[in-house]
Amino acid sequence: MNRWTNSMKRCIYFASVYVFLFVTAARCLAQSTMEPWLTRSTDNSRSGWNQHETQLSQASVRSRGIARTTIIPLVGDARGMEAQPLILPNVQTPRGLRDVMVLPSMANVVRGVDAHDGSAIWQAALGTPIDSSATIDSKNINQHWGCISTGVIDPDTRRLYQVCWVSTDNSGKPDPKTAHYFMNVLDVADGHAVVAPVLIQGTSDGQDFNAQMRKQRSSLVETTADGVKTIFGCAGTIFETGSGAAGFCFAFDVASNKQSAILALTAGEGAGVWMAGQGLVADPQGSLYLVTGNGDFDGKTQWGESFLKLKYTPASGGSAATLKVVDHWTPWTDLVRTGQQRASAMKVAGASAPSEAIRTPVNGGMNVSLKNARLESTVSDRGQPVLLVFPDMASGNWSDEDWGSAGPACIFAIGVCVAAGKDGIGYPIKMADLGGTTVADLANPPANCKKLAAPPVWLTMSPGPVDPCPADPRTLNFFPNGDTAHLHMTPVQFHDPLLKSWTIFVWGENAQLHKWAVDQNGRLTYLAQSHEYASADVRGESPGGMPGGFCSGSSNGDDPNSAILACTIPYGDANSSVVNGRLLVYDPVHLAADGSLNVLWDSQRFAVQFLFNKFDPPVIDGGRIYVPNYNGGVDLYELTP
């Protein structure tokens, strides 16, 4: 009996060892399928496309479907996170070799979790966040304001760089004297601080970064400039007008762990950088690209409503590092959009400073009434009737047409960036020569548009025969069918192997998902759209809902059958309140019989409930789709067995 028992024990022992080794091997095999997701939208071009996805495909999603297998919790904030999750595979942690997902919450608590199942690895608290109030967010969507932007991971050093807004006196009050932004440098393996938090600070063009409350929503980017590894970030302000209300960009030197340069983007007011959370684009040569929002423009030191190219020069010898605007292109100014001054009469100094200052936080939105509105009937390019609504409202509202409401799609292979904002107009811009718009150029907008790589187009919707680059920019002051057409998602880039052409996907407010071809010269050609609408529950209730959809894509190289596109949209107006969301997975290559984009999976069909995160696109990696929600966590979707 004892011999039989000992024999059984040995069998059980060896079986346990076998199971352990099998599970460990399976985990390592699974880990090898994960791709690094080191920055928002996967790469420095902000393509939003993972080209190395081997498990999710049109066939696997269509035949097996996906299911939400867990919700990974964030810590300390009811809404969870505004940053996009980041992933660094194959990290040796105190809990073994793991694919680490980094999740910074708005409560300034960063979690490192296993990307496969969300299990905890480490947690780091980075200081007291700022409590939400109408001073910061007129809608009070968020509970706290802490780690707002997406950080960046350096794969060589396994370090996370994350900027967070901290109440240095622990009061949580939005006071510029005590509420400051700090760069945190954490080891991705265990979350420990590599150095003490570094204060973001400095003056530029007479503007003091810490004299006003900034909103550092724009994500970070790491690149090599003149051989020097550097992190860059940008910010806007809580209030866009008034003394000191300027956008800023800053540089952080990786080797020294010190801030090395700072640049105010206007000597006047505005020119904030937010791009709905997107970060700067960094090309292989180290040049940086961004789009600013509302504010002054003079083409010299005031860069509101502009597409900018920045050049960073590292410190050398006795010379300090510098960050400068080296080129730009500007479509119009706030002052002209409000009709307060003709372009031909603009003064160079403070050229577009709006006389009707917008004193509400930057997410205030538009209050549109159809009373006394002027109506024009047109027919869209797709043959559908469109009613153009020109609201009878204070002209100052039209100084809130943020061109920088979305990040640009910069397709390095053809040297073109497509930038679009709240008008929903896509402007193809030559990266090698942006155009250098002057105040005089703005007196003749059609001539200014000739500097573009190709003519602009209505990207998020079609209002019919309306010139997207008119002689009088005030003719753009309308809402199609009474709803806004803003773009907030950065267009997703995909080289379609069947078309043998670059394509982009955009999802504007109160509209459908659109697919466009981009040729070698930057010319945009409409291809298809979905049947599904963003903010479907409030379309037609002027001004409709915000912010449109957010998407990410994946494929296994150039295999056209492997490509999928995952998008989230709100049912209601996610700017004014917390609303339910919808997750859709599309076939981005093969169109349906009616020419529309094919839906492979729809959360609505399976009654999957989640609260929509209004600035965060999904992450597709390793056979999983991660969807940050406003329930305080991240939904993890996987293929069903």
Model-derived features: positions:
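Bacterial N-terminal signal peptides
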Residues: A15-R27
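An edge-strand/N-cap motif at the start of beta-rich repeat modules
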Residues: Q31-H52
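N-terminal secretory signal peptides that target proteins for export/translocation
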Residues: M1-F14
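Extracytoplasmic/lumenal domain signature
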Residues: T33, H52-R79, Q92-L97, N108-N142, ...
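Conserved, well-structured interaction surfaces
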Residues: E82, L86, V110-R111, C147
